[in-house]
């Protein structure tokens, strides 16, 4: 290896010729302990207008494992022309994601070895030779000491993950969640809390935890508890399928001791009457592990019926899963379970590209903001005298029903879907079952053509409606087009895996941060096969003002206040404002104040909000019609990368982004002219969130990326591609070339004018018309330019001529 000339080797060559031999010689197994090009993130989805694109992410060059699922070290390699430690910082970031203490950086000359387990006084980073790469046993021993594992823990900690043979492996955060939970349980911790954002695979994570504890014989009888039938069925039929005949779903209020894995609804094993408490059929020590799904909903509450199950099996290890731990005076997830062993937030999920970003459209209705007061002695549709007071947003569809308001909301939803796609899966969150039924009826009446095609276009899916509940599986199935619109109150707030939901409508009073996060979670799942990369929230009840709460950890891409008329009117500028962001001069407006909070306090309780379905009939509700319901003015707002509410056009975003990189026009043009391929700069700026199609729509001209940036960022007069091509011809620039070369360059200039610089930078353009009539690609190059270098030089000079800037006055 010492005789190998490294100086001209690429990064890939360094890995193949230097790194892999060093690792293998140290005793690492290529099948089970070494993975190359490990992609840890998916790449954040950037939404600009109607275009969504993923940000390109790098992969860890090599990750070393004790065994699959237990990572130990990260190796980052660079070409030999770089300094030996060039990849260290990149490697440290990957190590943080994987929670490993060892990082190796190399350029082929040796390794810089970063050892976070080093004792005080020892070097954290040191250089070692290729021959001194540590063995698997050496790193595992250091790792175990760093983690503080005992001998008794090791059989549990090293238990294999379930492998279905498909190559599917847990994502980095799932690995951390699983491994940290296993560590805690094997160390004797009996109450464990795991917090993972909706849509990040909590159930799959729970399966791997249970599988490893069960297979290692650490836990023999396991109870998985949920409070929705669909959650139990989804779990049994999907992630938990490998348990096979060892698993059962508790039914008939009977716990069968013949099974080891029991899946149960809380309601199926307990109730207010003693004979309903099926959990008492077995001894208190029957289960040694209980996993509680969506544990924020009651298991941590001392007076909850669910809590008596946990208290009865108090000797069992209890693991709580939730996206939203609940912390109020009455209920505390952390008081019961302790601090989370791991947290993966909505914000992290969106940043990593595992969850969908979203836009917000706020619709303000005049009676909501200004209130409505009955005339003296006015009666409602049932002949009841209406209490004389001002009814406002908190009252509507709770204690006061105004038919015109319901119809306006339904019409706005319909108009929005017509502008986007009438077949986009939509969930409408209503205040109660009665509201959900009225909303269903209003939407049916406003969509006769769609309902004629399929009478399940709109369905009410609530706890009281067996027909509606029977359609829930079809609604969440991406392959089933119907139902399209689901109106609901409580049933679909949690646990419903609606991957293709593209529109979430809020016509519900939501003051609970817990519930708000759960509802937002209905849309955050990504399904690229069906084109679902982002979604929209249509908010009629100011629920999205909870974004301003410091406890909310996943800011929206954009927020827009609008009117039903703007959504309905095809001639309005609603789409432009939503998709392109209305322009404001940057110096004039850099931010706006958050709108005033509603006249009630945001808490983390559900005291005011949608009614529990069993309590609806206890509330006195007035029902009126004939009320004039109108709209108010609109405003457009967006959240920036730091979560601050600003008013900014996409031009402003582009300006800020470019000025960070290139402070002056000279800096930018120098970089542009010096680049061998302009496409590289175009691609680099795309990675920073600049989407050319959207910028072109805002600028409104057929401009080259170079001109768009010079115009928008530096105030230069814009030239179209055709104008630039004509300017080159006017300068008689071609005369220094042979006739054959002039013909090629003249046609390249036409190609540039038609399609842009990226088109002419590909050598394959010479295979297209009209070049194909001039000969084969090698013939064209040889006849006109001598060789490939001559052609590249001529192309570079042509680009310099194209992008020549006019002289500027001092």
UniProtKB/Swiss-Prot annotation:
It catalyses: Endonucleolytic cleavage of DNA to give random double-stranded fragments with terminal 5'-phosphates, ATP is simultaneously hydrolyzed. Keywords: ATP-binding, DNA-binding, Endonuclease, Hydrolase, Nuclease, Nucleotide-binding, Restriction system. One of its GO terms (molecular function) is ATP binding. Residues 578-608 are annotated as: Disordered. One of its GO terms (cellular component) is cytosol. It comes from the Bacteria. GO terms for biological process: DNA restriction-modification system. SMART domains: DEXDc. Pfam families: EcoEI_R_C, Helicase_C, HSDR_N, ResIII. Residues 578-588 have a biased composition (Acidic residues). Residues 412-575 form the Helicase C-terminal domain. Its EC number is 3.1.21.3. Residues 183-343 form the Helicase ATP-binding domain. ATP binds at residues 197-203. Type I restriction and modification enzymes are complex, multifunctional systems which require ATP, S-adenosyl methionine and magnesium as cofactors and, in addition to their endonucleolytic and methylase activities, are potent DNA-dependent ATPases. The subtype B restriction (R) subunit of a type I restriction enzyme that recognizes 5'-GAGN(7)GTCA-3' and cleaves a random distance away. Subunit R is required for both nuclease and ATPase activities, but not for modification. After locating a non-methylated recognition site, the enzyme complex serves as a molecular motor that translocates DNA in an ATP-dependent manner until a collision occurs that triggers cleavage. Belongs to the HsdR family. NCBIfam families: restrict_EcoAI. PANTHER family: ATP-DEPENDENT HELICASE IRC3-RELATED, TYPE I RESTRICTION ENZYME ECOKI R PROTEIN. The type I restriction/modification system is composed of three polypeptides R, M and S. The restriction enzyme has stoichiometry R(2)M(2)S(1) while the methyltransferase is M(2)S(1). This is Type I restriction enzyme EcoAI endonuclease subunit. It comes from Escherichia coli. The gene is hsdR.
